[in-house]
Every structure is written in structure tokens, then in C-alpha cells.
Amino acid sequence: MTSHSDRPESIPATSDAQPSAARRRLLYAGVAGAAALGGAGLAWWKFQPHAMEQGVEEALWAMEFEKPEGGVVALKSLAGKPLLLNFWATWCPPCVEELPMLNAFYRQQAQNGWQVLGLAIDQPSAVRKFLQRIPLEFPVGLAGLGGTDLGRSLGNLTGGLPFTVVLGGNGRVLHRKMGQITPQDLQLWAPLR
């Protein structure tokens, strides 16, 4: 005698059945969401300053850079006071946009001991031409492509610009920022020593 439950029409559907359209949409949405989160996380990580190379702070203060107008700027001459070190280039729109703000910060904070040094990752002739059009009150050093290596040693692994490093009067890195600075950044940094 066969039981009623042995009939094929009474056997429940197995997992071999096709998922419904609603389930497929949920599955696709979940996969797309996970991919978006992963991509956003990777982008965030890539543009964060990373660990600095060992001994870079000490080596930094021994460096000298030619100035566009002639002569050299020695970082050791800037030691003992807070320093905003900005890596920039004439061909970098966010760099050019933030320079007037950096110039105003320098003007306003110099009496509080602040110093600003711009390190141009650029050809000397391009920097000279640029500074004739847009003069800056703070000193500029011609870092060339070697400035990219210095930025990397300070934690800018992508070599992106602009890149800003804030150093305290004791010579230690207090803050690093990859990307264009904001007025809020400068307000946050101004009380640092």
C-alpha cells in the first residue's frame, strides 16, 4: 500500500528550483552593496596617510631645497616652531585653490610662531612663472620629483597632491592630510605647538 505522501506532486520543491525574481533582485542588491562598500573602503584606505618610514622626522630637518628666487631654504632654520609643510604643484587644481588660504594662514599665524613651507613637486621654470602670477608670502622650496619620495616617506603612499604635514615645534609630526585643506583644518591646527 502506498501512502499519500509518496506521490510526486506531494514532494516539496528542492533547492534545485529557480529563485523567484524578488529573491534574485535581493541577491543582486546584496552583492552590489557589498561591492560598493568594499570599493569605498579601499578608496578611503588608499587616500589616508599611512605609517611613516623609520627616522624620517630626523632626516627631514637636515634637508635643504633651492628657492625659486635663488638661494636655499634649510629646514633646520625652521626648527623649534610649528611648521605646516605643504606638497603642491602648479598643474594640480586643488593645490592651486588652497594656496591663497595657506598664504592667509601664514599671514595670520606668523605672530603665533607658525611657519609655512610649500614644497613644489614641479619643474623650476613652471614654479617661477606661477609665482610671478600668484606671489606667496611664505617660502617655497623646489622639491621636484624627489619631493614625491619625501611625501611617501611621510605616509603619502599614493604620491597624490596636495599633501600637508603639520609638525610641532619639537620636530614631530602632529597631523597629516591627503587632499585639499579646509578652513576647518587650519582652525584645528592653529592651536597646535
Question: Language-model segments: what does each one mean?
Answer:
Residues 1-22, 32-37:
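N-terminal secretory signal peptides
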Residues 30-62, 129:
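N-proximal helix/coil linker or "cap" segments that precede and/or mark the start of modular domains
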Residues 133-136, 144-191:
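Thiol/disulfide oxidoreductase modules built on the thioredoxin-like
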Residues 62-82:
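A short beta-strand-turn-helix
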Residues 96-135, 145-152:
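Structural microenvironment flanking redox-active thiols in thiol-disulfide oxidoreductases
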